Amino acid sequence: MDGDSFQQWKNQCLNKCDFSKKGSVDEDISHVVSFINSQDRYFTTSSCSGRIILFDAVSDCPDVQKQNCSWLFVTHQKCQMEDVVRGLEKSVGDATFKFEPFVLHVQCKQLEDAQLLHTVAINSGFRNSGITVGKKGKIIMAVRSTHCLEVPLSHRSHVLVTHQYLDFLVGVANQKMEENLKRIQRFSECLQAALQPQEEKCSFKEADNKTVYRRRRKRTQDVSVTDSSQNTQEHHENTEEEIDCDLLFLL
């Protein structure tokens, strides 16, 4: 991607208003978002640290979209059963209890940059992460996981579950939130290990992963610069490193 186009997109995205319901970046991931946006080759386009929500939808309506739902309760932290019960009392349709894990969308300058970020996400436990390339050349890396939870609680305002089962669901959702926050922390640590300058000492403890990040970072740096004086043996060694890295992304 052309450097000027990428920088223009980055400036436009970071300077526009936040149209989310909350209107700001979630506190638990603000350090991650700030770190990514400080990098020349990345910027975030949307994010959510993870949330527990209770929403009400129109009964017998197959089109369950945000515009057809009302939020009865939402938190980005662990929740209490009393909060869910109070929200459920407001239901006039079909209430659903849901946990949504951390999600982050990052626009990347080059495909190699997205591949590096993808490796970080996978190693941090976000196994559903992926890369998309748009028609205009926009490269988006989405950090996602699959440990969601979605359970219907009422139909036509009639509650379908007992208080005991509701208490169980709240406990499950809170456990998922705890695991979600641990994965965010791992992602933050892996991210800093992968993107910090080459000369700085890496604080990430897993040596194998450091090697992967170092190799991928080296490939990214070598995209625009080729050493014409490189001898045959060095070229062969670098080729083996690139093949090794490519195999990692096929696993």
UniProtKB/Swiss-Prot annotation:
Region (Disordered) spans which residues?
213-240
Q: Give the GO biological process terms.
A: tRNA methylation; wybutosine biosynthetic process
Give the species this sequence originates from: Danio rerio
Q: In which pathway does it act?
A: tRNA modification; wybutosine-tRNA(Phe) biosynthesis
**Keyword presence, tRNA processing:** yes
An example molecular function term from Gene Ontology annotations: tRNA methyltransferase activity
Recorded family membership: Belongs to the TYW3 family.
Return any one Pfam family short name: TYW3
Q: What is this protein's function?
A: Probable S-adenosyl-L-methionine-dependent methyltransferase that acts as a component of the wybutosine biosynthesis pathway. Wybutosine is a hyper modified guanosine with a tricyclic base found at the 3'-position adjacent to the anticodon of eukaryotic phenylalanine tRNA.
Annotated catalysed reactions: 4-demethyl-7-[(3S)-3-amino-3-carboxypropyl]wyosine(37) in tRNA(Phe) + S-adenosyl-L-methionine = 7-[(3S)-3-amino-3-carboxypropyl]wyosine(37) in tRNA(Phe) + S-adenosyl-L-homocysteine + H(+)
UniProt name for this protein: tRNA wybutosine-synthesizing protein 3 homolog
